[in-house]
């Protein structure tokens, strides 16, 4: 029998030590990975609740197990809040991740071998948009579009040309490393021209969309997916949204369960409900605007210091820095910044001569530091420190100096106050 007083401490100190070390790392390091953020204690409370004990295969009111009357209410709250937040008619809150939400869309709308058109991973797309190593590239005939390497922007006429040539059944608009605004009406126009479904993956910008600071794809897309972390600041999880279409709704529901998943994670769905409510609070829009302001200010510092920022800047929460001209690799830059307690991720850039394990770029994002309370002043200072390290790569004295300044800044802006 379990006791309410059971604790990890004293029972599994090896695990607790690793957990505590990670929490301390989050406090002591500046987090600039664009897909990472900090959740509220309310989100964590939901995830650590007794809801983790409940199996609930099926959907509210249509479960395969008994005892679901309360978790039905939890899931329905999450569904209604998601619909309200994004102006959707349909929401499925059960996907365990963004990739599983995307897989459900493929399963619902396509047959194996069908042609899909998505953004190349090397140009800012995502693994699930047709990369050869992903199910999306293994099970489907994946054709890729990219950016114009001169402008750093998507060439929609070129996307249209490719679509006319390959006649995809589905076109994917979305990214993991593209810093400009997607033209959803133009994507809709292209999809209609070739009779394709338009699938928008807004995982990176969902928080900006919810705040009204980035175009909402719902009026244009046949289906939209997102993660619930990143700019939404919720738990790790996925979400599917759509306009009213009973036939497609049934397909999406069946593709999630039983098509790709079994029982939903009710404790995570409760945490999603919390984060959707938080995203409807008045301060959420101000937070998202600060995310954009901080990213734009940081990108400008890199430009002023002589670095190439892909696409020439950013409209959202992230930007890519190309290190090709400096002759540096993303791997070495990532490691040097890590020694100074600044966490970024190496990232491929267009025409990258290096492998994806080495790369010639860095992806930098501001959601986490903005949650921490950083404003433009702190982000400009931070960008300068990063440039100092890149200009003196491998210089231990420079790294140590930056690390001491990072420590002071982190002390001034704790993750949880």
Curated annotation (Swiss-Prot):
It catalyses: (6R)-5,10-methylene-5,6,7,8-tetrahydrofolate + glycine + H2O = (6S)-5,6,7,8-tetrahydrofolate + L-serine. This is Serine hydroxymethyltransferase 2. The gene is glyA2. Gene3D superfamilies: Aspartate Aminotransferase, domain 1, Type I PLP-dependent aspartate aminotransferase-like (Major domain). The modification N6-(pyridoxal phosphate)lysine is found at residue 230. It is found in: Cytoplasm. HAMAP family: SHMT (MF_00051). Pfam families: SHMT (PF00464). Belongs to the SHMT family. GO terms for cellular component: cytosol. GO terms for biological process: glycine biosynthetic process from serine; tetrahydrofolate interconversion. The record marks 229 as: Plays an important role in substrate specificity. Its EC number is 2.1.2.1. The keyword Chloroplast does not apply.
